Amino acid sequence: MTTEPGYLSPSVAVATSMPKRGVGAAVLIVPVVSTGEEDRPGAVVASAEPFLRADTVAEIEAGLRALDATGASDQVHRLAVPSLPVGSVLTVGLGKPRREWPADTIRCAAGVAARALNSSEAVITTLAELPGDGICSATVEGLILGSYRFSAFRSDKTAPKDAGLRKITVLCCAKDAKKRALHGAAVATAVATARDLVNTPPSHLFPAELAKRAKTLSESVGLDVEVIDEKALKKAGYGGVIGVGQGSSRPPRLVRLIHRGSRLAKNPQKAKKVALVGKGITFDTGGISIKPAASMHHMTSDMGGAAAVIATVTLAARLRLPIDVIATVPMAENMPSATAQRPGDVLTQYGGTTVEVLNTDAEGRLILADAIVRACEDKPDYLIETSTLTGAQTVALGTRIPGVMGSDEFRDRVAAISQRVGENGWPMPLPDDLKDDLKSTVADLANVSGQRFAGMLVAGVFLREFVAESVDWAHIDVAGPAYNTGSAWGYTPKGATGVPTRTMFAVLEDIAKNG
C-alpha cells in the first residue's frame, strides 16, 4: 500500500492506419450508432473508413446483431473479430447518427468504453475520426478520465490486480491530430491531479501537506511559489483564514503559485493577467455550527476548488500559455474545539473589512474573502474563483451543474465555455437587494443572511464585496459537481471529479487567444 496518491496517465500515440503487429493484447474501441428502425432496432459501425475493411465492418455488425445491440448511448459490447490483429473489439453506442458530433458526447462515450475495459492495458480507437470540433482531444480526455482510478490507500487484499490503462493509440487522419491528442492528454492528466488531491483522505491531506504538494507540483513546471504559514498570516492580517483555522491543531496556510506567461507572448505588454482563487478547506466539520454526521465524510472534498486551481495553474505552465496566471489558495481545516471561532465572533478580513460570524459552517467565504483581496492587489484583468461554496447550489442546480456568478459579461463568458467543454456551468444572478440580508449590528457584514432562500446567491453577494471594482470576476460554485457521491457515469468516477479544472483552463486559453 502507498499513501502517496498519483494516477499514472497512459501514454498517447496517433496513427493513420490500423497497427498490424504487437497489438494482440489490445482492445479496439469502435463507435456504433442506431439504425433508426423502430420495428427492428439495430447498430451499425460509425467512423470505420479508412481504418477498417468492409468485410471487417460486416463481421462486427454481424456480431452486434447476434447480441441484439441497438447502438443506444452508453451501450457497450465486447466482440471477438478474427480478421483483426487485436485481442477483441469493444463497441460503444452513440445513439442516433449525426452529421457532426458534440465533443462531450464523444468524451462521454470514450469514458464509458474506458470504464468497461476491465483489465485491458492498451486500446486503439476510431472514435477520433468522427466529424465534429475537438473530437480528437475529447476522445483522449474521455479515455483517460474514464480509466482513472484511486487506490493509494487500499491494501493488497482489495487493490486492483491489473495495471490499468497504460497505452492509447488514436486512429486519426487529421494533420494536427498528434497536437490535439497530446493537448487532450495534458488536460485530462491535470484533472486527474485534482481528483487525486480531493480523494486523498483528510488524515493525510491537511493544510501544511496540501501546501507541500502544491509546491512540489508547481516547482516541477517552473512556477514561482510562496507558502505563507500561520504566523505570517496572522501578522499580515489574514483574519478569515486564521479565524477558520484556529480550531484545528493543524494550522492554516496560504499558497501563491505564479505562472509568468507574458514573457512567452508576442507582445508581453499586452498580455493579460488572470488571478485564480480556490477554496482549500481540507476538512469541514462545520466548526461549532457542526454538520450532521450522516454525510460529513464527504467533506474531504471541501478543498475541491483549491485542487482545481492548483491543477489549472500547473497546466497553464506545462502548456506554456502566454498570459500571467497567479493562483492564491487559502487552506484551513474547520474543526470544533476550545479554540475554534464561535457564532457571534467578529473577525477582520485581510484588507480591513469586519465580519460577524453568525454561522461557522459558512467558513469557505471567509477564507476566500482574504484570498480575493490579496489576489486583487496584483491588479489582474480577470479573477476566476471556485469553491464548494454552498449546499444551496445543489438545491438550485443539482449535482452536475455548477453555478457561475460574477460580473455579468465575464460570468456569461465563463458559463458558455464551461458548457462547451462539458462541465455545464450555468449563469446565476447576484441581485443587489440581497446585500441587505448581510447587514450586521456589530460589524461591516454578516457571513450569512437570516433567510432560508437564495443561499448560493447570498454567498456570491458576500464575495463580491471583496472584489476590486476594476476586475472582471467569476465565481464557480461546485458544491455538488466537485464530488460524485453516486454511481460512475460517462467519464466521471465515483468520488472526486476534478470539476471545474477543464472550465478554468479553457477560459485561460480563451483569454490568451482573444484577450
From Swiss-Prot:
Main location: cytoplasm
Residues that, per the record, bind Mn(2+) 2: K279, D284, D302, E363
GO cellular component assignments: cytoplasm
Active site as annotated: K291, R365
MF terms (GO), sorted A to Z: manganese ion binding; metalloaminopeptidase activity
InterPro entries hit by this protein: Leucine_aapep/pepB, Macro_dom-like, Peptidase_M17_C, Peptidase_M17_leu_NH2_pept, Peptidase_M17_N
EC number: 3.4.11.1, 3.4.11.10
Cofactors named for this entry: Mn(2+)
Keyword terms, alphabetized: Aminopeptidase, Cytoplasm, Hydrolase, Manganese, Metal-binding, Protease
Record's signal peptide: none
Free-text function comment from the UniProt entry: Presumably involved in the processing and regular turnover of intracellular proteins. Catalyzes the removal of unsubstituted N-terminal amino acids from various peptides.
Family designation: Belongs to the peptidase M17 family.
Full protein name: Probable cytosol aminopeptidase
Source species of the chain: Mycobacterium bovis (strain ATCC BAA-935 / AF2122/97)
Gene from which the chain derives: pepA
